[in-house]
């Protein structure tokens, strides 16, 4: 399965959204939302970056999450995205200090 498809499905399930609801919230017509999201999740079609941005916004994940090759990196990307700027700066400083040891 293409990594985008895997990440999309994981994020959708975590958000407790149906394929149809996610599609509608991302601006896809109600009549085709479910089918189109299914095609994205199965890797049959690839969304353009504009759609990726809309999906990311609805799912509260950064666009980079969808393209992270491994699960640990994907988790780090999401965690950093969901904390505020001060917490992110502190996490980065801690990480830099740890890596320089």
Predicted regions and their residues:
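A short, Lys/Arg-rich alpha-helix, primarily the initiator
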Residues: 1-14
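Helix-turn-helix DNA-binding elements, focusing on the entry/boundary residues of the two helices
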Residues: 8, 19, 34, 49-52
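Alpha-helical residues within the helix-turn-helix
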Residues: 13, 24, 57
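Short alpha-helical DNA-recognition segment
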Residues: 16-39
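Phosphate-coordinating loops and pocket residues in cytosolic domains that bind phosphorylated ligands
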Residues: 39, 67-68
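DNA major-groove recognition helix of helix-turn-helix/homeodomain DNA-binding modules
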Residues: 44, 48-65
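Interfacial/linker helices and their anchor residues that mediate assembly or domain coupling
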Residues: 70-101
